[in-house]
Amino acid sequence: MSFTRLDKSRKISAPHGTELTTCNWQVEAAKRMLMNNLDDEVAEHPQALVVYGGIGRAARSWECYDKIIETLERLKPDESLLIQSGKPVGVFPTHENAPRVLIANSNLVPEWANWEHFNELDKKGLMMYGQMTAGSWIYIGSQGIVQGTYETFGSVSRQHFNGDAKGKWVLTGGLGGMGGAQPLAATMAGFCMLAVECDESRIDFRLRTGYVDHKATNLDDALKLINDAMAKGEAISVGLLGNAADVYSELQQQGVTPDVVTDQTSAHDPLHGYLPQGWTLEEYKAKQESDATGTVNAAKESMAVQVRAMLHFQKEGAAVLDYGNNIRQMAKDVGVDNAFDFPGFVPAYIRPLFCEGIGPFRWVALSGDPEDIYKTDEKVKELIPDNEHLHNWLDMAKERISFQGLPSRICWIGLKDRARIARAFNDMVKSGELKAPVVIGRDHLDSGSVASPNRETEAMQDGSDAVSDWPLLNALLNTAGGATWVSLHHGGGVGMGYSQHAGVVIVADGTEEADKRLGRVLWNDPGTGVMRHADAGYDIAKNCAREQGLDLPMLDTK
């Protein structure tokens, strides 16, 4: 079989409107969302099938992509398509309430679960890296991480600055698909931000889509923009063209200490995701092929320089946090023994939300009409009338977030709200208030769907950080509940060997059957997050389980 990764002639865009090209809306949704992942306005490098996160792909090759589309277009309502690391490998009879697509991406037996072995298989065309929402077809552009980042920066503001971020600034690295959300989220939370990015095209993309306010090509100009804005009490963001390790070190040498320091480069993948100091992008890309080992070593040494600077900033009083790209581990691998002295963002700022099943709930309007999203925004406000913080988020999102590809929205809600909101959306489709069905999903970064000891499950209070039964149970339960597609991935966010995680997507098509499926799946899915945290002993999760009536047989066992 031929194997084409790069095809510069490709330009993918998901169909809009109400005309079906498949047997029903469940299958149509899978087709459109796969295509949407590769839209030029959504993906980082769509002609190479790369959606975000280093080499996170939507399909293994263009031949596989074409065959997936062809298979979805002939799939019957009682069949399920199986995807193995981006390749369509089988269609089997199931039933109409079963998932239409079942996906497994990047999974390796633990002894072989490392980048070296994965890269061998990847070169042979036997695997692909699915990241989290790239290979599970529910990426929505940088908006997908904006609210989570906004929630984190809001928590940083409350914990360290009495809730007032005015006159404070954040230093970070990386403006890719995930990192690109940081500048907008920071300014929404009241901070100024300096974001270092080595690829100028990424800064330009974030400028064009409104995620970053200014571009600078040297540190002095960037700092002047930041300082002038803070003096006026304004919150702005600056994308600085440069190498993160260089800039962090230069700030340290100048004696400049930011108020908050983090990083969202693709440090999880040292071969493809982190530019070594002193290298050009062209040199980096060439050496990925000619000297993979040397490239990885050089990238990790540069990460160590950056992490040492972050540790220095922490000693100088900055609030320093790992934002989930595993840069601490990479630095520790090459001798920074105290790399973990600064915390990850989940245990420091997000875990109480996870204890209530609260996480990144997202939905997409298959009509392609932004008005459908604005109507659902208002429905969420109507159904959750007393959450001013959520209302503020939805208002800011409408005003400040540009849609990428099919119109979409994200908001962090939990066990008590997801199912009832999804069923309300289904009623809106049924009544014709929405022009077409709505796709509902989430990030794999959620309360019950991931095991990642250096990120989502870092520092669990019972020591169960590395137990990965939980995402497997989550995927099994969502399959049994009737989700439209379910995925099981390895290595997302933090790289090979460091995480296992599950995704779920379900369609609200206005039918009675969909109403029942939505009620099951979107109760069960966040319910597994409350279950996982209650099992680990968190009182917030135990109380939530009791209040919401979860049936957890060991809940009150001493």
Swiss-Prot record:
Q: Which GO terms describe its cellular component?
A: cytoplasm
Per the record, a Pfam family? Urocanase_N
Cross-referenced PROSITE patterns: UROCANASE
Keywords attached to this entry: Cytoplasm, Histidine metabolism, Lyase, NAD
Note on how the cofactor is bound: Binds 1 NAD(+) per subunit.
Its pathway is: Amino-acid degradation; L-histidine degradation into L-glutamate; N-formimidoyl-L-glutamate from L-histidine: step 2/3
What does the UniProt entry say about where the protein is found? Cytoplasm
- Where does it mainly reside? cytoplasm
> Mind listing the GO molecular function terms for this protein?
urocanate hydratase activity
Q: Which InterPro entries match?
A: Urocanase, Urocanase-like, Urocanase_C, Urocanase_central_sf, Urocanase_CS, Urocanase_N, Urocanase_Rossmann-like, Urocanase_sf
Catalytic residues identified in the record: 411
Entry EC no(s):
4.2.1.49
> Which coenzyme or cofactor does it need?
NAD(+)
Single Gene Ontology BP annotation: L-histidine catabolic process to glutamate and formamide
Spell out the reaction equation it catalyses: 4-imidazolone-5-propanoate = trans-urocanate + H2O
Q: Does the keyword NAD apply?
A: yes
UniProt binding sites for NAD(+): 53-54, 131, 177-179, 197, 202, 243-244, 264-268, 274-275, 323, 493
Q: Which NCBIfam families match?
A: hutU, PRK05414.1
Q: What role does it play?
A: Catalyzes the conversion of urocanate to 4-imidazolone-5-propionate.
Record's family? Belongs to the urocanase family.
Q: What is this protein called?
A: Urocanate hydratase
Organism, by scientific name, is Idiomarina loihiensis (strain ATCC BAA-735 / DSM 15497 / L2-TR)
Upper classification of the source organism reads:
Bacteria, Pseudomonadati, Pseudomonadota, Gammaproteobacteria, Alteromonadales
